[in-house]
């Protein structure tokens, strides 16, 4: 399964961003992991890399939170009776990713991968609102990250 990704760079500084292939690999791993328990067809999604101003605006508009955030997920809502391979949109804020990676003392690639996987799982219907959901989602993220050769992103919390 190779997802079709519309990668949009809306950040003033695009240096140091992961490649389209890296994003595709990370999404593919999340989808492949999920496909073991469900039937996911060929999937299309948009990944938009933004600056803090756009992240802040979207976070305020859609979540009522007056600050920028690292990743926003907007699942595509398919009308009943229509089958489309559209999964949704991920909005990832470049500056927040860089700040968090520095604060957490992790590689940029690891943090980009984690947030891409985290957002993709949200598009697949996972959430972390309650403790049980959070444990399930974080467990999946940890497994996928380790399959990709990265450290468990929640290791410090365990």
Swiss-Prot record:
Location(s) in or outside the cell: Cytoplasm
Domain of life of the native organism: Bacteria
Cofactor annotation remark: Binds 1 zinc ion.
EC number(s) on file: 3.1.-.-
Stated role: Single strand-specific metallo-endoribonuclease involved in late-stage 70S ribosome quality control and in maturation of the 3' terminus of the 16S rRNA.
Similarity remark: Belongs to the endoribonuclease YbeY family.
Name the UniProt record assigns to this protein: Endoribonuclease YbeY
Gene label: ybeY
């Amino acid at each position: 399964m190779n997802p079709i990704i519309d990668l949009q760079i809306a950040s003033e500084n695009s240096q140091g961003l992961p490649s389209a292939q890296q994003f595709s690999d990370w999404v593919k791993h999340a989808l492949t992991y999920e496909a073991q328990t469900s039937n996911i067809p060929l999937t299309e999604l948009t990944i938009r890399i933004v600056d803090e101003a756009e992240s802040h605006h979207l976070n305020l508009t859609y979540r009522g939170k007056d600050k920028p955030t690292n990743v926003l997920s907007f699942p595509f809502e398919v009308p009943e009776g229509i089958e489309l391979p559209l999964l949704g949109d991920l909005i990832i804020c470049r500056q927040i990713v860089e700040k968090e990676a520095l604060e957490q003392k992790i590689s940029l690639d690891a943090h980009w991968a984690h947030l891409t996987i985290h957002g993709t799982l949200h598009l697949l219907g996972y959430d972390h609102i309650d403790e049980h959901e959070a444990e399930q989602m974080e467990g999946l993220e940890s497994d996928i990250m380790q399959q990709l050769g990265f450290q468990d992103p929640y290791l410090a919390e365990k």
